[in-house]
């Protein structure tokens, strides 16, 4: 489909009106009547078509308006990329080039294996360091897009003789892709509105904290590249719907394939695009463009997504993919009915329509029920089901609810991660709904669904951030265009609709009255009152102040909240000097250097990836959490007393036990604060042995002091955390054994171990490692050793001076001779 070109008079008036309108001109001229800033040519010229602009010669260069606009757009995008990349380097500057958090350590370890052994070995890699004694087949249980991307960049750089360590590639991958995300957001917003809004959206998403939180340097996680793939897929989908081109649809399928390989959030795409098509059908906006775009996307995208080993046959056998299949069948039926509509009478078509829709709906409904009942279609997984029923995971699957990223989002988090964009985002949504068309239906659905999911789960704030940046950019763009534009030449933007096209073909009715004026023509020709220069200046300054405050807030949040690696902690003194707490790496290095290569370490699943990545030791559970029963067994060991836990540890061949304790430095993320989740997960698998109520006081409190539950004070986790802590007095104002994290004096200070021994405690007591003793060769007797209370009358004094004198046995029993009973007493 050829896009209409804008007249030359439009470029001239836009450039003369204001600098912001000049920036908008390229977007308006590119998209014709799709963009809100575009004007109708016949209207501007009083119904007479203006002359076509003369083609620019090769010597035009930057003398043409489009040349300056292209240069300005390129400069703004480059600066946005540079600002986004630079703001993500706080962690590298303050600490060093290091992998952050927990999951990135497994991704780095997998990427290192891929770069060292090749792609084929990576797909067939069996990791014996994880989930002892089960192990893990890595190639079929990961989304390999992140590893392949980093490995490919590393291979290209080394091919060009640029020697770079694979760790540095992993550290700086997410900041690099943030620039690509800015470009893809610019392209998508330009398709939805105009070029000025696209440039604002690119600047917003480059520095917004909601996206920076998962893309700082060192955060080598799937989301670092997945948001770029998400935005680029949406851009290509909008392009496909607007043009109906198979080429753009195939590009969309390839981008979707990359998204599937990178992140499990691809399910959001495969449900949002069918929802878009379904709503277009309900709004009677069906067209051949929509049919070509979705039919091609579903078939090719389905086949490509099934090539990922971890995905496999899920697109045709899981409930979260069934909506796409249903919309595909509905679209084919709708297209077939449109075909019959042109060949049947109205009465025949209505009868066939109701009969066909009823039969098709009944057949689909019965088929889904049958396939679900027989087990061919798997039900919703726990993570997806918890999006609809927010209390489901906490009751039935506590392992999902125990993850901090799966908690509901607080109201403060929205402002903290989005700042002023929260307020301007609804305004941009209203502008899109007011000037609705096919692609703006998509962004409206995107916004509504993303807001819901972000409210349910804090992790999904990441999917809300791009659409908030886009719609806020549209709102700011309209304000700037309104207050920086020329009052005499401002007109309402036309909206592409089927009713407008009908009015153009039928400008008047034969039976209209002579003095009758059509309503919509009157509204279009209605002029607005001019705005004074003072009002324009005040509003513009206020908008610029808001944007400056937004930039300052983003920089502050990035620096203070999202640029601290969890592996290295830092604290500040009263004079501003900084203390580095490197207990984690200290403990992992001790494990690497002082334990056997095949030693097995038991810890809570949060630290499994870090132990395998930094200490290179075998773990029982890790952050993959694919086996709930195995995690529950570890939780049972932590929640039981020492004797019961020792039996579990012996059955799992555990050599060392690692716990995190923050009572000395006030670290709130330690294992005592996570302990109730261990109890809940263990109770789900072993309800007869572990009960959560046993760890609370009769008043229902979780306390670590003397008033705490006896079950809690004698469990293995409590004893390992507070061993020898009762002897430590941290401050002259507090008693010995005072826990700074829970602000309480511990209740059990006399802790002794029978089956464990302390092997290592880090400098600040943050990481504590215990060695599991081997079983005794001979069982100890149950009875106590003999104790006598009979002592000699005289204190022993050694008089042995020569060998001839007899010796003396110390503590020898003294027997008293009995007396004969006299006959008189009898």
Swiss-Prot record:
The chain crosses the membrane at residues 42-86, 174-192, 195-212, 224-243, 246-260, 266-282, 288-313, 322-341, 351-371, 411-433, 440-456, 461-482, 527-552. A motif (DXD motif 1) lies at residues 101-103. Keywords: Acetylation, Endoplasmic reticulum, Glycoprotein, Glycosyltransferase, Magnesium, Manganese, Membrane, Metal-binding, Phosphoprotein, Transferase, Transmembrane, Transmembrane helix. The record marks 214 as: Important for catalytic activity. This is Dolichyl-diphosphooligosaccharide--protein glycosyltransferase subunit STT3B. Its cofactor is Mg(2+); Mn(2+). It is an enzyme of class 2 (transferase). The record marks 103, 405, 674 as: Interacts with target acceptor peptide in protein substrate. It catalyses: a di-trans,poly-cis-dolichyl diphosphooligosaccharide + L-asparaginyl-[protein] = N(4)-(oligosaccharide-(1->4)-N-acetyl-beta-D-glucosaminyl-(1->4)-N-acetyl-beta-D-glucosaminyl)-L-asparaginyl-[protein] + a di-trans,poly-cis-dolichyl diphosphate + H(+). It holds the Pfam family STT3-PglB_core. A motif (DXD motif 2) lies at residues 221-223. The modification N-acetylalanine is found at residue 2. Residues 1-60, 490-512 are annotated as: Disordered.
